[in-house]
Amino acid sequence: MHQLFRLVLGQKDLSRAGDLFSLDDAEIEDSLTEALEQIKVISSSLDYQTNNNDQAVVEICITRITTAIRETESIEKHARALVGLWDSCLEHNLRPAGKDEDTPHAKIASDIMSCILQNYNRTPVMVLAVPIAVKFLHRGSKELCRNMSNYLSLAAITKADLLADHTEGIVKSILQGNAMLLRVLPAVYEKQPQPINRHLAELLALMSQLEQTEQYHLLRLLHVAAKRKDVEVVQKCVPFLIRNLKESTYNDIILNILIEIAGHEPLALNSFLPMLKEIAEQFPYLTGQMARIFGAVGHVDEERARSCLRYLVSQLANMEHSFHHILLLEIKSLTDAFSSILGPHSRDIFRMSNSFTNIAKLLSRQLENSKAESGRRRTGTEVSFPEKFREPKTMEPKSEDHEKLQVKIQAFEDKINAESHTPGSVRRYSLDHVSKEERKNVRFSRSRSLALNTVLTNSVNVEDGEIEGKTGMHASISLSEIDPPGHGIGKVPFKTDTHGSQLRNSSASHPSIIHSEPENMPETFKENVQEEIPEAAISPVEYQDKLYLHLKENLSKVKAYALEIAKKVPIPDQCTIEDNTRSCVAKLFFTCSLKGHYCLYSKSSFTLVSQAPQPWIQIMFLFQQSLFPEPLSIQSGSVQFLKALWEKTQGTGTHSFEVAMTESTFPQQKDLDQLQLHLEEVRFFDVFGFSETAGAWQCFMCNNPEKATVINQDGQPLIEGKLKEKQVRWKFIKRWKTRYFTLAGNQLLFQKGKSDDPDDSPIELSKVQSVKAVAKKRRDRSLPRAFEIFTDNKTYVFKAKDEKNAEEWLQCINVALAQAKERESREVTTYL
């Protein structure tokens, strides 16, 4: 063990404990296991819970050890010692005596838990950790259980088999109120369904008490259970699903579960068909899914087929065109399965009308006729049709258009026949499931390729109008689509420091302006800059100072403008001007004015490199003036700094600082628009926002303290949901894979499927260099909701369900990146 560890732990020397952070991680890495064993001895002593010195030493040492393990990536080497210390905490009291006060051993358990379970994707570590983690669900404090649940949920994404043996304990923890663990159940169900099935009724009873994300995971569990075709599960969940179907939030998900059930247990839904009809009337957009359920139930026997056909036919006449394809497929599937319902001419009904309304009328008429025959099977009886729907006996010679039409109609009929003979549980009629080749080639005419003989004649009258044969195929419709400003203004003036290189306000929230002085700067300027003279104390010669006179004349306008502009454009805390190969750029640093407990930028800063430094300098100048009741002079210290920055960026033929500020007091609107656009492009507004209450720009956490408390729970996901990930890097190849992603801890995770590459790994936030929406110039119809994540060696492209969802993902990822950076900055300064 390292000498300093031996000294601190052996003598429990709190005064030297902070020195551990001055050691290099690699220098102490070999000592970590031994140090953990020594900590276990100290924490197990009888007086540990009352000995504040020992507790402080242990806390500092654990922080140093876990930091070194993370930085050296040696978790597997020290996992056994970590888990041993973690397990020993279970022998002691973990429940707090008072509110918001953890016991000493609960603090140890929390620190160790965070270190271990952040490595949920490492199998050797999780094999040791999961059995202990499950014990904490029943023994730990409420806060500890909640954090443990978050980490176990993440572990279930990649290592569900390790949790399967503990399914019973997980279910009991959920029933005791730990609903976060519901997200684990879909992952472990296939391995251990019995414990979940035994408590399924109790789990379903929790639905009304759950939050929206927890309800979603409960429904995911039912979907997984439905696929296993367990009759007992079906009997329990169908009434529950029907009851909750009236809630529009989840009716799409619930219908997908019911479709799964209808594929293998259609009779379970038979008694609920009237209720499903009512719901379909209330939510017409569910008609396509309802049609599949009615089609599946109709295949049970002829009596149910007739009943379901009446509903499907009525929808065919009433629904919009997007549902007609699905409805016709289900109708044809039922009439093919029970040929006696329509007789031998069922095919003619589909072929002899160019109107879905007419098809529906003919089908309804035949259903009534067959019902009047008292259910007798009439396999050979000819169906009578009105004269105007009969095929003409004489046909014109077949033209080239005629042949093309025949090919299209035959292709569509073959498609219907092929799909009709596919089992209901396999058929997918949603347009989302149609292959790209089908979208390209399978097209409907105005009559949806069902008006076979009517379109072939020159002029055939129908009930709803007249169609001219000479118009051919008409317009083809594809099967595929569809106060004080700024940073908290005070009245304390800026002062220059003794080195003359920085300008800072006594209030930490005020900006500082840094200028790297050129070597050839006149000594007199340097001396003037270094003098500590309060701004208001300067007495210029009014008639010689144009800037002073101009500001005096327009002071009220300047202050009003500064007040408004500070709400739209943040004022940087610090600014440097740097030369690059082409021009000068401004490097701007922004921090949060509040610096609350969960602040994203209390120790770190948001850095922006701008190719347009002069508008920023002008905005900073206006901000400076807004701080003082009197006009600023060109001799003012802060103005001299801004002037020096301006001159460093000044191009040939451009105005001097004084001329620019007097001739154009305010930045041009196009320049402001460019600044705001740049801030949007670098996702500044994801992590900062102007607080009307505080009158200042604050970080996301400080602006949303109620969210910050939830987000900062260990392992709590910032966001989760389905995204489409682009599988091929070339733009012209549009191949996407849908995955369920979770942003939590320091990673963006996804649930792996059987077909996924085993080498696919989560995205480590520490390796992310930038995140941005797909550039507008690259956006086309396929990428209106896409964003990119850039790491040191790869670019990921994702697509959300809509632009709003994409913005939510972008903001959450940027907040997570800021959190990680802030956490790193805090750890550097801890105990030093």
Swiss-Prot record:
Q: Name one GO cellular component term.
A: plasma membrane
The record's SMART domains line, in alphabetical order, gives: PH
Name of the protein: Ventricular zone-expressed PH domain-containing protein homolog 1
Q: What GO terms are given for molecular function?
A: phosphatidylinositol-5-phosphate binding
InterPro entries from the UniProt entry: ARM-type_fold, Melted-like, PH-like_dom_sf, PH_domain
Compositional bias (Polar residues) spans?
499-510
Keyword hit for Metal-binding: no
Q: What is its main location?
A: membrane
Q: Which organism is it from?
A: Rattus norvegicus
Q: Which residues lie in coiled coils?
A: none
Give UniProt keywords alphabetically: Cell membrane, Membrane
Q: Name one GO biological process term.
A: negative regulation of SMAD protein signal transduction
Q: Which family does it belong to?
A: Belongs to the MELT/VEPH family.
Q: How does it assemble?
A: Interacts with TGFBR1.
Pinpoint the PH domain residues: 716-818
For region Interaction with TGFBR1, the annotated ranges are: 201-319, 663-832
Does this entry carry the keyword DNA-binding? no
Enumerate the subcellular locations listed in this protein's record, separating them with semicolons. Answer: Cell membrane
The protein's role, per its UniProt record: Interacts with TGF-beta receptor type-1 (TGFBR1) and inhibits dissociation of activated SMAD2 from TGFBR1, impeding its nuclear accumulation and resulting in impaired TGF-beta signaling. May also affect FOXO, Hippo and Wnt signaling.
Q: Domain annotation text?
A: The PH domain is required for membrane targeting.
Q: Pfam families recorded for this chain?
A: PH
Record region (Disordered) = 497-519
Judging by the UniProt lineage, the source's domain of life is: Eukaryota
